[in-house]
Amino acid sequence: LRRQRQMCIRDRYKNREVVKSVSLSMEKGEVVGLLGPNGAGKTTTFYMITGIVRPNHGRVMYNGEEITTLPMYKRARLGLGYLPQEASVFRNLTVEENIVSVLEMRGVKKKERIATMQNLIEEFKLSHVAKSLGYALSGGERRRVEIARTISTNPDFILLDEPFAGVDPIAVEDIQNIIMQLKERGLGILITDHNVRETLRITERAYIMAEGTILIAGTGQQIANDETARRVYLGDNFKLD
């Protein structure tokens, strides 16, 4: 299996070590969670994997190749997709145009652009809003468009930053199902989100971060039962089911 790995990376911001020593890995065909309280270093870790931030120490490896110094766009070309928490749809373009625009930027020929767009519209159940402008979409519809655009670039791995934020409970379940479909397609998916239960329910394993380090790693149930995870992050009354 191809693997994307981040090994013992560190990052310092304004003389404060935000990420102290983090080692994690992800393989194709699995869903992995990266969770923790505010200020734990999750976002910075995400940024170092995607290339937004360069670590002060350590390496980022992709399929056996070091990519620590590669810019974000080159990592994307290798197959590393990233979906930020902030809304990224083009508000004044239709759903169809949103998807086609990404394909245009990659130099895909027109006939192939149209075919790919139509397939993604159908796969992500966006036919009813295909002609709608980005600003008119609900939170769940917007997320589906953003994921469809990310998939259009044929990544091997996707990093999802707060995919459940700003969507209603029904849409959360919808996005969970989409993530499982992506897994079935063989993609590796790394998720960070404050919706702990929703994340742990769809991950094979997860990492809990606190104060810039990995506190615990394991399955959702192992983490839910861990005393340290409960004390630092989950709370004594946390239950996965």
Region roles according to the model:
Residues 133-137, 141:
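Conserved ABC ATPase signature
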Residues 1-5, 9:
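Single conserved hydrophobic/aromatic residue that forms the stacking wall/gate
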